[in-house]
């Protein structure tokens, strides 16, 4: 995975179940649009949000923005999020609340398996990592070493 990193200057969060935001997201001029499966989606609507992704991805990308999907942190939610999110039109997954490299490696294995199942190039899906607590700070270098890494927010 030696391809160049994306040049994302502006990223726009869009709740994947919000028709109002989906309808206009592609007109806002963002370099990347983040379809949110995490905080903007209540637990009862998580599955509906996953099912909405195949229609939402090309819709928000129609003016050339890259598409990123923010998945949930708990593994029981992250696994179905990955199954729904990894597809040719999704450039990256945003991984929230990362605490260490082990979690990132595990998610990378799941993404690799999903890409292979879909016949996609392994490594197509990049990672944007969100460091949201101090426990991860000693592990930043190891987290950043993940080959799928496109960016990190601390």
Each predicted region: which residue ranges?
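Conserved alpha/beta-domain cores
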Residues: 2-154
């Amino acid at each position: 995975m030696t391809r160049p990193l994306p040049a994302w200057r502006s990223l726009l969060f869009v709740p994947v179940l919000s028709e109002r935001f989906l309808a206009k997201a592609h007109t806002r001029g963002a370099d990347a649009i983040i379809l949110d499966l995490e905080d903007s989606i209540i637990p009862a609507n998580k599955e509906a949000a996953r099912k909405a992704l195949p229609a939402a991805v090309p819709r928000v990308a129609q003016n050339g923005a890259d598409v990123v999907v923010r998945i949930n942190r708990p593994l029981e939610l992250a696994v179905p999020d990955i199954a729904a999110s990894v597809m040719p039109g999704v450039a990256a997954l945003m991984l929230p609340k990362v605490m260490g490299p082990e979690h990132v490696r595990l998610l990378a294995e799941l993404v690799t398996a999903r890409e292979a199942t879909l016949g996609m190039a392994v490594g197509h899906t990049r990672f944007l990592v969100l460091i949201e607590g101090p426990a991860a700070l000693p592990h930043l270098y190891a987290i950043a070493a993940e080959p799928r890494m496109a960016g990190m927010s601390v």
